[in-house]
């Protein structure tokens, strides 16, 4: 229908280890087909615009896993074969009209290149996006992944651009508002550290010096990055959504970006 054509529906197949989803099975051709059929039924649609692979079977360094990340236990031939079979299945599903584009998530530079090269074997098929964490405090995408995605024409869909709401300052001074995310996840998946608390305080002061709301600074900064496709934000209520949308036309000037980079150099990788 015309109304459906106006929508862009994106969903994922969950990765290995989610015991409540497919008994924790990883991402394999059979699992992909079952998951897509389930999503089509649940979403009551004939096709999915963007279908994403949530987490590599081999694991990755995201969600603060880079502090102890060790890829040497991986078997290169096994990983390459899995990627080959997964891409073939996704291509078949595209030919069947069930998906339009494919994306990665929580992927590494090596994994992105493998998927991109495999997709090039098929006509009119490529990796459209990668959904990884990116924010004022989390900028590990800026190096190898930025270069990889530039050359492979893969756009970043940034999740947690507001650092789980931390950038607002509502958790400073050990505050834990009732029903907040921090009240449910005590360390916010490793985001709550002395350095992140210090950095957030300084970004809030930076926002004030330019008469900006820290939410607008955070989202506008992400949008300013050359590799950005879109920014995924969350809002728990209408007031939060109104505040976010109020800054949709804000574009940061060079002097603001220079101060952001200066602060990031001062407190690099704060979480």
Give a label for each model feature:
Residues 1-3, 32-47, 144-153, 256:
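Short amphipathic alpha-helices and their capping/turn segments at secondary-structure boundaries
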Residues 1-8, 41-44, 94, 116-123:
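Acidic (Asp/Glu)-rich catalytic clusters
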Residues 6-29, 54-57:
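Structural motif corresponding to the early beta-alpha repeats
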Residues 8-10, 49-52, 101-105:
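Outer-envelope exported proteins of Gram-negative bacteria
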Residues 19-33, 73-81:
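Active-site mouth loops of central-metabolism enzymes
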Residues 27-43, 83-88, 112-116:
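Short, acidic/polar
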Residues 41-64:
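Active-site groove signature of glycoside hydrolases
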Residues 56-262, 267, 271:
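Beta/alpha (TIM)-barrel catalytic core signal, keyed to glycine-rich beta->alpha loops juxtaposed to Asp/Glu
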């Amino acid at each position: 229908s015309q109304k459906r054509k106006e929508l862009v529906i994106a969903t994922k197949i969950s990765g290995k280890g989610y015991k409540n989803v497919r008994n924790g099975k990883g991402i394999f051709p059979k699992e992909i087909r079952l998951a897509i059929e389930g999503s089509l039924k649940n979403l009551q649609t004939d096709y999915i615009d963007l279908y994403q692979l949530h987490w590599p079977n081999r694991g990755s360094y995201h969600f603060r896993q880079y502090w102890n990340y060790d890829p040497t236990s991986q078997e290169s031939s096994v990983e390459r074969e899995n990627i080959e079979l997964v891409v073939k299945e996704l291509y078949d599903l595209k030919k069947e009209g069930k998906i339009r584009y494919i994306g990665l998530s929580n992927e590494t530079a090596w994994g992105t290149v493998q998927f991109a090269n495999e997709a090039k074997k098929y006509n009119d098929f490529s990796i459209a996006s990668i959904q990884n964490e990116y924010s004022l405090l989390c900028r590990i995408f800026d190096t190898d992944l930025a270069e990889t995605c530039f050359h492979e024409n893969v756009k970043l869909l940034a999740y947690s651009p507001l650092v789980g709401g931390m950038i607002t300052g509502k958790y400073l001074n050990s505050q834990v508002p009732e029903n907040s995310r921090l009240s449910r996840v005590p360390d916010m998946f490793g985001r709550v550290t002395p350095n992140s608390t210090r950095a957030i305080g300084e970004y809030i002061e930076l926002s004030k010096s330019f008469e900006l709301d820290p939410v607008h600074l955070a989202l506008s900064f992400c949008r300013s990055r050359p590799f950005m496709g879109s920014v995924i934000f969350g809002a728990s209520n209408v007031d939060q959504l109104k505040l976010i949308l109020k800054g949709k036309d804000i574009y940061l000037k060079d002097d603001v970006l220079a101060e952001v980079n200066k602060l990031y150099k001062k407190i690099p990788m704060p979480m």
